[in-house]
Amino acid sequence: MKLQSEIIQSDKLICSEKVLFNKIELNAKINTAIKTMAKDNLRSSIATILSEANVNGRLEIQKQFEKLPFESARTIATYSFLKDSLISFAFDVVQTILQSPKSNETVLDYISIIAVGGYGRAEMAPHSDVDLLFLTRPKPSNRIQKIIEDMLYILWDMRLKIGYSTRSINQCIQLGKTDQTIKTALLEHRYLCGNKNLYDDFDRKLRRNLFKASATEYVEEKLEERANRHERQGGQRYMVEPNVKEGKGGLRDLQSLFWITKYVAHASTHKEMIDQGYFTQREYDNFLVAHNFL
């Protein structure tokens, strides 16, 4: 199985990819479970194996971060990579072993698993929620629904904090038009596994039918949201105990700036924003320094 992270490259990680997630070792454990466990207990056994891999991966990240305490960007990317690896592996196991296709039915034709929100940005703290979109056709088959159910039970049994939705492309667009929170979460989408063509169609239609038509409205909404957030935090920049996430000049302000630029520029990467003149390279470098500090 090839992991399909669109953003996270091995040179962005704080520790070795192989040490963090040993797929060969996991496959061996899964094969042993298949041979020794009753089918009714197999899903639980898979969850236990992946839970151990998650614990070991987190310990490795913690150990490396203690050695490199200022490498915050690499650390949050590594937590995201670990979750990518676990989710992609779980999907592969579910759709080939627990819910193997019958006749010519191919699961990849009907489902794509997408990271959204903070997870979609590949920015995860140790206890961040894992926000997932199970993208399906308008009427998913019973088998696809069972795959999603098995996936969720495995992830829940691993004690991951899962936020999820199961939607078609049109449902995502319609909900994004009426709910700013959903719209922003969809702005930060990233392919994990499943049908890449379905994901690419989703990406194109979001940009054409949701983001492109509502840039001015989105900017106004975000600026109003920022003003209300500052007021709730007291409206002061200098405080004895600042809220580094929600306060004035905090992490959420930096994220809002990035969201607005990404939305207006119709850009997927910071390079596209720089090429279009929304940031200079120096401004973006300063942005990263501030972001990493927070």
Describe these PLM feature segments.
Residues M1-L294:
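A nucleotide- and high-energy phosphate-metabolite-utilizing enzyme signature
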